[in-house]
Amino acid sequence: MLSVEERKQVAAAVKEAAGDDFTVIVHVGCASTKESIELAKHAESIGADAASAVPSVYYHLPPQSVEMHWNGIIDSTNLPFIIYNIPQLTGFNLPYDLFKKMAKNPKVIGIKNSEEPVYNMERY
């Protein structure tokens, strides 16, 4: 597992190698919103195209707490944001109501849904 500083170094190296030839989306998910915000701000500073985050994988949070976590990240930068739903690893499956709420934010540009089985995505 990488530290926040190591993750910053990796993100910077990827962006430098990608230049403007590729879209760079930096995953900023951490157990704490504070560290996620730190990574999101760094992603913005290196010129990343977007940020993405899962809910906390350690703490099993209710939807309103996940919403606060994601909104804290979103509000910390001008980067577009991609919700990452991977319930088999996080213990949190994005409820449709929260998805609808989050989708109203113009910075939310998409969702990476790794839910299994994949046909469950039809609900979104």
Predicted regions and their residues:
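Active-site beta->alpha loop and helix N-cap motifs at the rims of alpha/beta catalytic domains
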Residues: 1-93, 99
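Catalytic alpha/beta core domains of metabolic enzymes, predominantly
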Residues: 74-76, 87-124
